[in-house]
Amino acid sequence: MSEAEARPTNFIRQIIDEDLATGKHTTVHTRFPPEPNGYLHIGHAKSICLNFGIAQDYQGQCNLRFDDTNPVKEDIEYVESIKNDVQWLGFHWSGDVCYSSDYFDQLHQYAVELINKGLAYVDELSPDEIREYRGTLKAPGKNSPYRDRSVEENLALFEKMRSGGFEEGKACLRAKIDMASPFIVMRDPVLYRIKFAEHHQTGNKWCIYPMYDFTHCISDALEGITHSLCTLEFQDNRRLYDWVLDNISIPVHPRQYEFSRLNLEYTVMSKRKLNQLVTEKHVEGWDDPRMPTISGLRRRGYTAESIREFCKRIGVTKQDNTIEMASLESCIREDLNENAPRAMAVIDPVKLVIENYPQGESEMVAMPNHPNKPEMGSREVPFSAEIWIDRADFREEANKQYKRLVLGKEVRLRNAYVIKAERVEKDAEGNITTIFCTYDADTLSKDPADGRKVKGVIHWVSAAHALPVEIRLYDRLFSVPNPGAEEDFLAVINPDSLVIKQGYAEPSLAQAEAGKAYQFEREGYFCLDSRYANASSLVFNRTVGLRDTWAKVGE
């Protein structure tokens, strides 16, 4: 990550500054602890930038730790994708990758310690009964009939759980805290449950697996984490985090701090809902360019720099809010406007024939790769008598506000000649199939000699040299700003979230690299789809338009 990216300020950094100033800590050690049960999304990017960014700015350490305590939902595929996403965003973890499963032996020992202290018991209520006994926000819970078992009985039963003597759902280990607590998380939470499933790291060694709240705090302590940063939904869980560490013989007690999660308009962040979109094939996969996943954004053409800039702009607070899509798009638009080379592509093509241009001949026209960056060089683009232009760039009749090609009037072809539309040819349905023009041979990249003004400029591609391309125009995945609030979020999927066009591009794009962004002049920013980089027909994804369209969406 570039050192030029300014160091942000927020309440968490203020806490760290104070901890260092008072000597509470002499170094900073954070962690990013995803569960490997899905692909990371833009919300995780905020946490990645926060945790790794803090470690980097304070010359500390940040661990990448996989919270792999549920083998049923986890997979090595997700482990690898998460590692790739973190590195792609420009960050590097300290030391080896950590896994909560690395600590399964120690976690088991601490569970036994709680049993010996009379602070944990084996419960044989069913999962439904446990929920019923837990009570509600308005009604206290009630004690399990198994709550007062002796230490010796609990130790024996816990060992029976570990050795496979119970079926799944028939027993669990619970903390013994307070069933009347105003905080439901403290009403004898489950610490261990039974799952007969092979684990991607430990195989079949275990059939009991610790719960997140028990694992998380102990893993932090074992790794020497100084500042454990979580999103606000874990605010009440901090009480359990502290209770566990206060009641086991572990010398280190990290502190948990909460910040607001990232909510983005016109999408969903729930892993369950994202998984449903994938498994029911509403999208192409986890890396579908309409998905809010980091892999989806990357495939769409977002850069790591733009995502880091977005996370910096939205900041870190305790106030939950929903970020407008325009905020994310402005970051990538600014990045690509500055750095993307230009190219020409026609998305909705119509043939244009220049009747007085030498037929069968062609010439090379010089074009800058960036209008404001001569250091990016130039390229040669072929020009001939037959070209493709965009259908929207021609009208038979138009008012003065229309600055493109009109029958009987002139327009300039980008970096080429001034042409005049003379007549059109139509099919049986009245659709224009060919526009016939003449050109001024003395206007190659210069104004007409007689001083007449030609205001409009349109882009083009030589028909004889054109590269056939598939162009995918992506829009928001949902038609309402907050689809997650809908009774059926699938009912508000935007039917026009993907429009596929068959167009033509200048031949230089045959050498385009997968994922590299280009500004298709007058159209928007596009990148070669990495999934189809080796296909016979190249596929370009629209990353973002040239202008903010979200203001209009909201009107």
Curated annotation (Swiss-Prot):
Name of one Pfam family that matches: tRNA-synt_1c_C2
Gene: glnS
Motif ('HIGH' region): 34-44
Record note on quaternary structure: Monomer.
Molecular function per GO: ATP binding; glutamine-tRNA ligase activity
Origin: domain of life: Bacteria
Xref: SUPFAM superfamilies: Nucleotidylyl transferase, Ribosomal protein L25-like
Main subcellular location of this protein, as a coarse class: cytoplasm
Family: Belongs to the class-I aminoacyl-tRNA synthetase family.
Keyword Hydrolase found: no
HAMAP family according to UniProt: Gln_tRNA_synth (MF_00126)
Enzyme kind, highest EC tier: ligase
Region (Interaction with tRNA): 317-324
UniProt xrefs under InterPro entries: aa-tRNA-synth_I_CS, Gln-tRNA-synth, Gln/Glu-tRNA_Ligase, Gln_tRNA_ligase_bac, Glu/Gln-tRNA-synth, Glu/Gln-tRNA-synth_Ib_cat-dom, Glu/Gln-tRNA-synth_Ib_codon-bd, Glu_tRNA_lig_a-bdl
PROSITE patterns hit by this protein: AA_TRNA_LIGASE_I
Cellular compartments annotated: Cytoplasm
Source organism of the structure: Klebsiella pneumoniae (strain 342)
GO biological process terms held by the UniProt record: glutaminyl-tRNA aminoacylation; glutamyl-tRNA aminoacylation
TM ranges: none
Keywords: Aminoacyl-tRNA synthetase, ATP-binding, Cytoplasm, Ligase, Nucleotide-binding, Protein biosynthesis
Sites where the protein binds ATP: 35-37, 41-47, 231, 261-262, 269-271
Sequence motif 'KMSKS' region, location on chain: 268-272
Protein name (Swiss-Prot/TrEMBL): Glutamine--tRNA ligase
A cellular-component GO term for this protein: cytosol
Enzyme Commission (EC) number: 6.1.1.18
